[in-house]
Amino acid sequence: MLRSFLARSCAVALLGLAAAGPAAAQSNIRGDATGPTTAPGFSHPEQYMHLTPVKPAPNMYPVIQHPDLEKNAADKLAALAEKTGKKPNILIFLLDDVGWMDPGFNGGGVSVGNATPEMDKIAAEGLILTSAYSTPSCSPTRATIHTGQNPLHHGILRPPMYGEPGGLDGALTMPKLLKDAGYVTQGVGKWHMGENQGSLPQNVGYDDYVGFLGVSDMYTEWRDIYFNPEVALSPERFKMMQEDNFNHYEVHCTPADTQKCENGKLIDLDYIKDLDKHWLETSLAFLDKMKGGTKPFYLYHATRGCHFDNYPSDEWAGKSMARTVYSDCLVHMDYVFGQLMKKLEDIGEAENTLVIFTSDNGPECEIPPSGRTPFRGCKGSSWEGGVRVPTFVYWKDMIAPRKSDQLFDLADILPTALSLAGYPGAKLAELFPKKTYIDGVDQTPFLVADDGLSTRRSRIYTLNQYYAAIRIDEFKGVVTGEIEDGIVQKGNIGGFSGSIFTDTGGGVVFNLYTNPQEDVSIGIRHIPMAVPLGSAAGDYMKVLFEYPPQFKVGFLSNNPPLYDVIPEGEMAIKAWLKKHGFGRFQP
């Protein structure tokens, strides 16, 4: 894969250079000489194709520098610190399987039968990011938020299921770094980043964590006679699942016990209805404790909703105009978010809290009813529908209300949060081992500065063990993509089944503005756009050789050449096999 990819990149670059020819003006049948126009409307400072990014440190992703914006943001933050006497708080509100077009602020809401007035109100007062990116599925995204790395570097390539080993174990995380910087760290909700001891919340930086360690369907699908009658109605098989080696309970995790979390209520089809209510109460109680405190706080609130299986409580069943369990859930999540924002105001911390609202991936289209996206693909794919997620950032009186399509990756949350905690730019690299690569970038100038601009020129797409694509401005070059096949009746609907992965011919480039469905490649006609895409993609391949891909959770039957041609990557998989073997893994 590497050789063919680099060969294609070089060929495209050479074609681009050959096509450029001499710089002299030319005439053609279309009329006057070619060349850039003097009309001012064609110049867009928020587009970076022509710019060269700079690495803040050798092990950090390159950025576009904005000295004036950096100073403006620093001045605003200094004034706020003088007023509050402490560092800014960080609140992350992470939804599950919610699509880009589900909330009203992205065109959904009332128009699709699930009103989201609380989300829409706060979004309108913040910065709406229309090109914010997750990874294709939940656990890789959660690990990306916590580590500032993409899946190839943190090694959680897919969700660990039913007690599989592997997770954050050994990773340096955002809550750990913030805790070291003087923050109180609270986690609430879905974990799903490993159940082994080293991956438990209290062992990666959380002072306190209340939630569950897995994912909704692990607790529900084998209990429900509608979804899995072959298990739910069988005494032997039901007992098999009851005794399976994964945690079946809501848990409370604290550093007082680093070996395990304390089990609370059993999560069954009744209690799962109340989890988001209980988790809201937990976060509200934490915020009450922070009122008037001298320490800044970090609150990570990861909802159960709206991952399948959704079982609305009596209070929320039927509340949406769509009257589906998914839309009822989303209306409930709107209420939860609104209550958290109200509490921030009540305790007087809204002016000192950066709020990041997002989803862990696109909608799960294989399990209807599901979320909505206007883009191609869904959860489990690297098409836009799988990874472009509804996102906004809010900070009362600090972030100007606006909307931007500049690039933002959820890996950027860690560098941005640590910048606010006192470690901007290259200072962040000093906190990490030199062999750890940081894929996120500090977006403080984008979020905080007046008329802020993104510091991210390009964005890497991954798909399980694949390096799938790269985006610069509105252009996306695809190296590996999912295509329909005949394995299942309906072919690829953008998820984990019914699709195969294949390398492209090297010239697949999409203009996401004119073709958001990604089905008309312009690469051969627009080779000048393919040249910088290929160059940036090649640069990241060099990064992968110096900072090799990791393998902590992945599909062993789906190992592409990327892990073969990079010796350390192949060794990571061999080390996994030596420790755990093939088949159904156990901790």
Describe the predicted segments one by one.
Residues 9-20:
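Bacterial N-terminal signal peptides
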Residues 21-25:
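Sec/Tat signal peptide C-region and signal peptidase I cleavage site
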Residues 1-11:
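Bacterial N-terminal signal peptides that target proteins for export
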